[in-house]
Amino acid sequence: AEAKGAIELLLGEAYARRDHVALVAFRGDGADILLPPTRSLVQTKRRLGQLPGGGGTPLASGLRAALELAELAKGKGMTPSIALLTDGRANVDLAGIANRAQAAEDAKLMARAIRAKGLSGLVIDTGLRPTRGLDDLAREMRVPYLPLPRADARAVSSAVDAALEGA
């Protein structure tokens, strides 16, 4: 719930700056692009409302989808950043199979691909306690890791703004 609140604040700020925002959800056995890059605050909030929580965490699939969207945005002259908000460890691999070890390797592979493309961003851990492995993932991406246990939406929003300010 707090992650959704933080995203709503970020959307309002992005709208004020006339930035484009895209939403990628990763759950179950894969990732879905809920919304391609848009400036529509109403449409983005509507899609955000459809975002379910819980279940498997196909983190690598989410990172792959975010990377693909970022590359498309770059091709259109935009300067994309990736803000990953999650409260879970990768437990579904790129093939959609529940395999924690392979899922972690796949997530690192995608993190290195994001780093290789020179994309900025950050990893925000929204869990009640720091989630083991997300700091390693951020290191692989060469982006900040922000563990925000029990943080409210404004704290998450401020952290994202600070980390992405130079993007």
Regions found by a protein language model. Name each.
Residues E2-A6, R39, Q43, G54-S61, ...:
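Charged, alpha-helix-enriched surfaces in structured cytosolic catalytic cores
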Residues G56, R64-E68, G75-K76, R112-R115, ...:
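N-linked glycosylation sequons
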Residues A1-P37, G62-A65, L69, M78-L85, ...:
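Von Willebrand factor
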Residues D19-Q50, A70-A73, A95-A98, P130-E140, ...:
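Short beta-strand-loop
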Residues G88-E140, L146:
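VWA/integrin I-like adhesion module and closely mimicked acidic/polar interface patches used
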Residues L137-A167:
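C-terminal helix of von Willebrand factor
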Residues A16, Q50-G53, L72-K76, A116:
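Secondary-structure boundary motif
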